Amino acid sequence: MRTDPRAAIAAADTALGIEFGSTRIKAVLIGPDHEVLATGGHGWENYLEGGLWSYRLDEVVAGLQSAYASLVADVRERYDVTPTSYGSIGISGMMHGYLAFDADDNLLAPFRTWRNTNTGRAADELTHLFGFNIPLRWSIAHLHQAVLDSEEHAPRVARLTTLAGWVHHQLTGRHVLGIGDASGMFPIDSTTGTYVESYLDQYEALVENRVPWRLRDVLPTVLSAGEDAGALTPEGAALIDPTGILQIGRAHV
């Protein structure tokens, strides 16, 4: 028997999905019968920053809030109820790219998106080092290019992630990434479900005299479907919905 959507929303028996695409941020509410109950969205565009394609992180937050508010308005119009929590929340976004932070969580360089292909030298060097193809857009190519170019911030990198990984961290406080997204940062070992250990060793030996960090300490922890990726924090709820209506409830992210 089909679940009443209004009752499911009121009981938080729903899943909220938010996807950060290149031109649109999309929000969708799914009910217990896997039916789309409501949608929302926000349009945005990347811009050139120092010759590289980027989005500002304040635009990420503003777009998240706008897309969510749009979804809530759709829920109210359809069902005359306001959602206050969800059973689960999923975040997805553009793969690859470069979001690097220092030990105090300060952004070290403007977000470099998947569109940037200024990493030819790094990608070639890593492909030969590993004997495994490293595409221009992968996060490790962007990181190594920053090292090769002796960018001022490169020695201070403490955390590297993707757009979805950054949003997830803001919502939960956890530096983790799903295995699909992580596979666009650094090669994954299909038998262990995490980064290829021998490649980590090779890379750390390559740059040990250039930077003080170890790559394995910088990359996010890789998680597979069904593993605990954290729960929505009060700060995360306020980030999504500054009106204060959204509560943490039991939402896993």
What function would you assign to each model-found segment?
Residues 7-8, 18-21, 90-92:
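Short loop/turn motifs at secondary-structure junctions and domain boundaries
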Residues 15-58, 106-113:
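Short glycine-rich, Thr/Ser-proximal phosphate-binding strand/loop in the N-terminal lobe
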Residues 1-7:
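A short, compositionally biased domain-edge/stem linker segment
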Residues 10-13:
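Repeat-blade elements of multi-bladed beta-propeller folds
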Residues 70-250:
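Glycine-rich phosphate-binding/catalytic subdomain of phosphoryl-transfer
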Residues 40-81, 128-131:
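N-terminal phosphate-binding loop and adjacent alpha-helix
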